[in-house]
């Protein structure tokens, strides 16, 4: 009994101060035959055997009560194969299990179990897996915490989108109205553009037809000997610049007829001065257009303008430097205009006098240029004729300057007449000018379109009359016999 009590006391003390080596030796090493007879005594030590059995049972219970490292509830950690799915780890809080009376009362056994658990080594794979899972769980926690804030803000702000939607619907109606109006304007602009394009194409076609008609008339005039040039067919002698000018001049004549009809209608309808002023200003702008066309044509072919093939035959009778004389135009106006004040008459006569002086100066300059050209071409060449022709070409190029100065004089005369006269007098003045040149063109058309049979009948009648006179005179001569 004494030996048994001592063994219990020893067991109690070992529960508190049991060395780790003894426990490790008891767990891993089986008692050998030498252990019973350790002290060399033949008696069997039941106290030591009881102590070993108790410690082995305590270790077994602690291992059963020890929670798993990464999982709870007996489930092992599962690794999901899809990277988008988080790795689920089951962590369980340590729960106190009811232990036996020896474990609940012995604090030493609890310390021993905690020490043994902490001292148990962990496998390398499990530690590596645990380190890889920890940042992943942290990132998931951060993302869930950050995504949780906008979700709450979105749940708190449903009224604001409804207000924005209401505003959008009201502004959408306004935008729809603006869009419809703009679409209507675009359709109208496209329609007008198509009409202008169609009119331009028709105008080009009519100009082409008129150009072909002019070529036919020129060819017929050359065949009849009425064309003064008389140097072959018109095709090779007309340059591209001259042909373009003829086409543009034909278009200008059409616009001139339209402006004349507007002025005539305005005067007959007794329009107001403001409305009539618009018509007169439009005609002046139309009159300036012909001078611009002539300036372009003079650079291309100055002889075409000087000869005046672009004009009607009756107009060519009064041509002066590729146009009309301003002084002759003023004479026509003075004879046709009435109810002019003395101041207006003085201004018109002063304009006529200055125009005549400018015409004489330009005419003298043109005569000097012609004489210089004659002297250059008539002089005998010193070495060869190339230098002589170069000088002659330089003198011919001066013709363009004379044409430009003559057109400036005509343009200034028309603008001065507009300043001297009133609006209605200016409208009447331009109507007289337009009708005068219209009659000249009509006279030329009548003369060119006269039938050939009339000419033949006139020649036949003249020849018959001559023959009759000869016969009658011969009869009278032989009547005495």
UniProtKB/Swiss-Prot annotation:
Domain bZIP stretches: 176-220
Disulfide bonds listed in the record: none
Span of domain DOG1: 242-450
Region listing for Disordered, in residue ranges: 91-181
GO molecular function, one term: protein homodimerization activity
CDD domains hit by this protein: bZIP_HBP1b-like
Cell location: Nucleus
Disruption phenotype: In the double mutant tga9 tga10, reduced male fertility due to defects in male gametogenesis, with early steps in anther development blocked in adaxial lobes and later steps affected in abaxial lobes. Microspore development in abaxial anther lobes leads to the production of inviable pollen grains contained within nondehiscent anthers. In addition, multiple defects in the anther dehiscence program are observed, including abnormal stability and lignification of the middle layer and defects in septum and stomium function. Reduced SPL levels in anthers.
Alphabetical UniProt keywords: Activator, DNA-binding, Nucleus, Transcription, Transcription regulation
Region ranges (Leucine-zipper): 204-218
Region (Basic motif): 178-198
Tissue: Mostly expressed in stems, inflorescence apex and flowers, and, to a lower extent, in seedlings, leaves and siliques.
Gene3D superfamilies: 1.20.5.170
Predominant place of localization: nucleus
GO BP terms: anther development; DNA-templated transcription; hydrogen peroxide mediated signaling pathway; response to molecule of bacterial origin
Compositionally biased residues, Low complexity: 97-109, 143-155
Composition bias, Polar residues: 110-126
GO annotation, cellular component aspect: nucleus
Motif Nuclear localization signal positions after renumbering to this chain: 165-172
Quaternary structure and partners: Homodimer. Binds DNA as a dimer. Interacts with floral glutaredoxins GRXC7/ROXY1 and GRXC8/ROXY2 in the nucleus. Interacts with TGA1, TGA2, TGA3, TGA4, TGA5, TGA6, TGA7, TGA10 and PAN.
The protein's role, per its UniProt record: Together with TGA10, basic leucine-zipper transcription factor required for anther development, probably via the activation of SPL expression in anthers and via the regulation of genes with functions in early and middle tapetal development. Required for signaling responses to pathogen-associated molecular patterns (PAMPs) such as flg22 that involves chloroplastic reactive oxygen species (ROS) production and subsequent expression of H(2)O(2)-responsive genes.
Family membership: Belongs to the bZIP family.
Protein name per the record: Transcription factor TGA9
């Amino acid at each position: 009994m004494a030996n048994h009590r001592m063994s219990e006391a020893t067991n109690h003390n070992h529960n508190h101060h049991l060395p780790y080596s003894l426990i490790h030796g008891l767990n891993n090493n089986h008692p050998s035959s030498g252990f019973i007879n350790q002290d060399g005594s033949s008696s069997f030590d039941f106290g030591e055997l009881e102590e070993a059995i108790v410690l082995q049972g305590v270790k077994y219970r602690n291992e059963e009560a020890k929670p798993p490292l990464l999982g709870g509830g007996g489930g092992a950690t599962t690794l999901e194969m899809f990277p988008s799915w988080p790795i689920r780890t089951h962590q369980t809080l340590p729960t106190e299990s009811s232990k036996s009376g020896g474990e609940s009362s012995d604090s030493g056994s609890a310390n021993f179990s905690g020490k043994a658990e902490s001292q148990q080594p962990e496998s390398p794979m499990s530690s590596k897996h645990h380190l890889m899972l920890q940042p992943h769980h942290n990132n998931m926690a951060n993302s869930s915490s950050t995504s949780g804030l906008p979700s709450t803000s979105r749940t708190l702000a449903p009224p604001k989108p409804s207000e924005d939607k209401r505003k959008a619907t009201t502004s959408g109606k306004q935008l729809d109205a603006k869009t419809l109006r703009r679409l209507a304007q675009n359709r109208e602009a496209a329609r007008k553009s198509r009409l202008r394009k169609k009119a331009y194409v028709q105008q080009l076609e009519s100009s082409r037809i008129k150009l072909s008609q002019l070529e036919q008339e020129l060819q017929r005039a050359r065949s009849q000997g009425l064309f003064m040039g008389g140097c072959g067919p018109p095709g090779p002698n007309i340059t591209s610049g001259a042909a373009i000018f003829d086409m543009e001049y034909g278009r200008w004549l059409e616009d001139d007829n339209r402006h004349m009809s507007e002025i005539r209608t305005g005067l007959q309808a007794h329009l107001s001065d403001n409305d009539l002023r618009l018509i007169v200003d439009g005609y002046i702008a139309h009159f300036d257009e012909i001078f611009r066309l002539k300036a372009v044509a003079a650079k291309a072919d100055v002889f075409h303008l000087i000869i005046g093939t672009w004009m009607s035959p009756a107009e060519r009778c009064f041509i002066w430097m590729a146009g009309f004389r301003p002084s002759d135009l003023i004479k026509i106006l003075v004879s046709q205009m009435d109810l002019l004040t003395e101041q207006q008459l003085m201004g018109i006569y002063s304009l006529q006098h200055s125009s005549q002086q400018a015409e004489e100066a330009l005419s003298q300059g043109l005569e000097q240029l012609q004489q210089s050209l004659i002297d250059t071409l008539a002089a005998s060449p010193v070495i060869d004729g190339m230098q002589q022709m170069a000088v002659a070409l330089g003198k011919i190029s001066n013709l363009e300057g004379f044409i430009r100065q003559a057109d400036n004089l005509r343009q200034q005369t028309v603008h001065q007449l507009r300043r001297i006269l009133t609006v209605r007098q200016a409208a009447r003045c331009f109507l007289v000018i337009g009708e005068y040149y219209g009659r000249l063109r009509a006279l030329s058309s009548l003369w060119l379109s006269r039938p050939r049979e009339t000419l033949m009948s006139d020649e036949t009648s003249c020849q018959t009359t001559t023959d009759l006179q000869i016969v009658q005179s011969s009869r009278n001569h032989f009547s005495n016999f």
